[in-house]
């Protein structure tokens, strides 16, 4: 099977290999390595260089991409190819210069016999198989040198030699037995005797008695004595025991008193320490877990007044103090100071299993006050006794350390390890000398399993607390992100709502402007047409196309006005007096094209109503000036109400024959009616219709719209002649009667029409000599301009040609009376 080769992708960018390399690669794959080296060695032998570079090895490693190999036979080089790799691999010039290693086989090592007598067991038989694992002790240079000396002496004595493993194992066993026996000696009366002293009391409850299940335990480092229940020791360890501060190697100061040392427990934070006795006697402080008597909690519940108390015994304000339990005594003192001074500190068990603490000051302790001189000599004696006890303990400990070898028996070690006692005695003497040279310090560190466990527990607590804080921080970060996302969402919603509100206000503003703005450019010149043709074709304008347009008219007009098709026009728009004087039929609306889509109208609804109301008022005014008609004539009312269709633009279906007259002729008609010296061609009188052609109910004005939709438009010829709109410019030249009419599009008059209405009246007053009432007529229409922008003055109104010929002279005599009637009508409206 071929060896795995490294596959390299050959390209012109990262390699200089050519097709020649490919052929050499394929050839090198078929050839073996020795055959490839034969061609190179003769040249090397000729030149005899010290080193050579072989390039065939790198060439043999590269294969082209097109070469068919299984994926297990090559590797893909992921690094970019370097040009210096083409130089080759440095190899020695002569293979004969390479030194050849010399290897020889050694016989298997047999364990030397260690028995001193023929019947003693050998080391290989009983010692090595039973030793568990390796040894904790490692030989140093001194041990190795001593072992050589020992083996030389044993060889001279014709005794078996001692190996290194046996020496290490014996030294470890000696150290283990010495540590165990010394710990046992410290715990017994032989070592110190302080545990069995009658004066030893619990550091928490100050009781010298122990019970079954509540033994008194001593710390092996600080020698503090506590009960199991008082310090929260769930199980008494078999070996040594250390308090929490000694296990952590710290010497903290109590948070509630100035004393250092003693039975301390940490707070919840783990950074501050409090005496268990202080936590029990100060009423505000509590203990989290009574079984373990930790952690100390509710430190913050201590009032400031207690922190401000000064101890009467040590004269310090450090920490917090308790006060005498007598009602009239306020003496303050620290808990530990009271214990050290021997004050009366009682623990009372109530009937409900409640523990009560009662403390008394120096004055109330033992039933009476203590004199200062008697208390002063007592203090030095107690201090001396304590010092003597400590000194005695240290002396005994030092003596035990100096006589360490007395705690170990060589025979016991030989029996444990199943070795010869004489050999173990040699090692025992060497161990004793080496340990004395080390200042009686052990050669091996003792197995402090309990200390390690306590430290590990503390580390585990700190690690769990750190992990808890980490998770808490992560949770807070998630909460912050959620709050930020909610805030951003609400801001976005607020922005969108505000934007929609602004859009709504802008739309309403535009709608209000469209409703209140006067349409500009709506009034234009109407189409010119003969009055006779309009009179003949006006009543016949109801073609089938117009009827279809009449049906669709109301819906389109109401839809363009923003109203539904079921909107009650008669009850909403026609309740006022001005609206009742105008009859709006569906046919008129359809034929006059109230189109909102035309480019000239921006404001359909105000233009529709205001212009029609204005036209109705002007029509009424013209009727008042006409002497041939009476105010009570129903024909005049009907004609006044039916002037609306003449104001509209011709529908697209109406051609030239039905086109209305152009507004250019209307100023001439107005001058013909009002002025006496007006010159113009005589107009023919069209046939006049009677009141029989009017709608059936002309006087009401509040009839519903469907009734007017079915009735045909009355007096079309006369209405078209009388109500044709005037142009804004009154100085337009009027063509002769021979000129053919031109159909022109109508435009609404702009807002400036209000100002232009007054000028024709002024000119007529100055040029023709009319009464002042005629000149004041535009003022009447100006009153309507503030409310309805589509009102016109009297000069813009036109009457039929017959009225211009018959009542031209009589009109001037009735101007003053007509003015007063119009004013009364305006006030009534």
UniProtKB/Swiss-Prot annotation:
Residue(s) carrying Phosphoserine: 9, 15, 117
InterPro entries per UniProt: Enhancer_polycomb-like_N, EPHD, Histone_Mod_Regulator, JADE2_ePHD, JADE2_PHD, Zinc_finger_PHD-type_CS, Znf_FYVE_PHD, Znf_PHD
Ranges of Acidic residues composition bias in the record: 792-806
Enzyme class: transferase
Extent of Polar residues compositional bias: 9-39
Entries under SMART domains matching the protein: PHD
Keyword list, A-Z: Acetylation, Metal-binding, Phosphoprotein, Repeat, Transferase, Ubl conjugation pathway, Zinc, Zinc-finger
Name of the protein described by the UniProt record: E3 ubiquitin-protein ligase Jade-2
Species this protein is from: Mus musculus (Mouse)
UniProt lineage: Eukaryota, Metazoa, Chordata, Craniata, Vertebrata
């Amino acid at each position: 099977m071929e060896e795995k080769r490294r596959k390299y992708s050959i390209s012109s960018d990262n390699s200089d290999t050519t097709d020649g390399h490919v052929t050499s690669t394929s050839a090198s794959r078929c050839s073996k390595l020795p055959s490839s080296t034969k061609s190179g060695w003769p040249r090397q032998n000729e030149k005899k260089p010290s080193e050579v570079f072989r390039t065939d090895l790198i060439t043999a490693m590269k294969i082209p991409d097109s070469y068919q190999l299984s994926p297990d036979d090559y590797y893909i080089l992921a690094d970019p190819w370097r040009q210096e790799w083409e130089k080759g691999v440095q190899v020695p010039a002569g293979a004969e210069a390479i030194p050849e290693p010399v290897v020889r086989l050694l016989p298997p090592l047999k364990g030397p016999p260690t028995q001193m007598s023929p019947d003693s067991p050998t080391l290989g038989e009983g010692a090595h198989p039973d030793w568990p694992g390796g040894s904790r002790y490692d030989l140093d240079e001194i041990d190795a040198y001593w072992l050589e000396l020992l083996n030389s002496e044993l060889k001279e004595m014709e005794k078996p030699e001692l190996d290194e493993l046996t020496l290490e194992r014996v030294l470890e066993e000696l150290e283990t037995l010495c540590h165990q026996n010394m710990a046992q000696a410290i715990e017994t009366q032989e070592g110190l005797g302080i545990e069995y002293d009658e004066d030893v009391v619990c550091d928490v409850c100050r009781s010298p008695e122990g019970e079954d299940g509540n033994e008194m335990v001593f710390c092996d480092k600080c020698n503090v004595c506590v009960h199991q229940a008082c310090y929260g020791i769930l199980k008494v360890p078999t070996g040594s025991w250390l308090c929490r501060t000694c296990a952590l190697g710290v010497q903290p100061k109590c948070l509630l008193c100035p004393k250092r040392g003693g039975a301390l427990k940490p707070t919840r934070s783990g950074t501050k320490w409090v005496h268990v006795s202080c936590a029990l006697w100060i009423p505000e402080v509590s203990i989290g877990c009574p079984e373990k008597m930790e952690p100390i909690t509710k430190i913050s519940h201590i009032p400031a007044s207690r922190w401000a108390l000064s101890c009467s015994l040590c004269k310090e304000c450090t920490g917090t103090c308790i006060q005498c339990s007598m009602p009239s005594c306020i003496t303050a003192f620290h808990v530990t100071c009271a214990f050290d001074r021997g004050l009366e500190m009682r623990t009372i068990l109530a009937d409900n299993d409640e523990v009560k603490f009662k403390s008394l000051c120096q004055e109330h302790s033992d039933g009476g006050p203590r004199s200062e001189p008697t208390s002063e000599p007592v203090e030095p004696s107690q201090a001396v006794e304590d010092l003597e006890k400590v000194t005695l303990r240290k002396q005994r400990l030092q003596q035990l350390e100096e006589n360490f070898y007395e705690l170990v028996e060589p025979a016991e070690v030989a029996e444990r390890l199943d070795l010869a006692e004489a050999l173990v005695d040699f090692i025992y003497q060497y161990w004793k000398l080496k340990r004395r040279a080390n200042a009686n310090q052990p050669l091996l560190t003792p197995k402090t399993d309990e200390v390690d466990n306590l430290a590990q527990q503390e580390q585990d607590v700190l690690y769990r607390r750190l992990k808890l804080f980490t998770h808490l921080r992560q949770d807070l970060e998630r909460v912050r992100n959620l709050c930020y996302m909610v805030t951003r969402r609400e801001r976005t919603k607020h922005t969108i709502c505000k934007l929609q509100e602004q859009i709504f206000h802008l739309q309403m503003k535009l709608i209000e402007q469209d409703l209140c703005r006067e349409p500009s450019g709506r009034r234009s010149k109407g189409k010119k047409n003969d009055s006779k043709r309009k009179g003949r074709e006006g009543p016949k304008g109801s073609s089938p196309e117009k009827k279809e347009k009449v049906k669709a008219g109301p819906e389109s007009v109401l839809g363009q006005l923003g109203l539904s098709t079921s909107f009650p026009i008669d009850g909403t728009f026609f309740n006022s007096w001005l609206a009742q004087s105008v009859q709006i039929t569906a046919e008129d609306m359809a034929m006059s094209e109230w189109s909102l889509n035309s480019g000239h109208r921006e404001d359909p609804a105000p233009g529709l109503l205001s212009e029609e109301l204005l036209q109705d008022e002007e029509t009424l005014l013209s009727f008042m000036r006409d002497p041939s008609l009476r105010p009570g004539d129903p024909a005049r009312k009907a004609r006044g109400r039916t002037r609306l269709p003449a104001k509209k633009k011709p529908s697209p279906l109406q051609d030239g024959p039905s086109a209305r007259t152009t507004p250019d002729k209307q100023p001439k008609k107005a001058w013909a009616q009002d002025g006496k010296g007006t010159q113009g061609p005589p107009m023919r009188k069209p046939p006049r219709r009677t009141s029989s052609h009017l709608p059936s109910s002309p006087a009401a004005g509040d009839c519903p719209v469907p009734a007017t939709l079915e009735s045909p438009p009355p007096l079309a010829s006369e209405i078209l002649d009388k109500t044709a709109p005037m142009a804004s410019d009154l100085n337009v030249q009027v063509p002769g009667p021979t000129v053919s009419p031109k159909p022109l599009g109508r435009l609404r008059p702009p807002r400036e029409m209000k100002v232009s209405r007054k000028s024709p009246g002024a000119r007529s007053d100055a040029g023709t000599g009319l009464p002042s009432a005629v000149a004041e007529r535009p003022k009447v229409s100006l009153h309507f301009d503030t409310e309805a922008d589509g009102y016109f003055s009297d000069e813009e109104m036109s009457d039929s040609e017959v009225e211009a010929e018959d009542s031209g002279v009589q009109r001037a005599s009735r101007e003053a009376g007509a003015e007063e009637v119009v004013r009364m009508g305006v006030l009534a409206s």
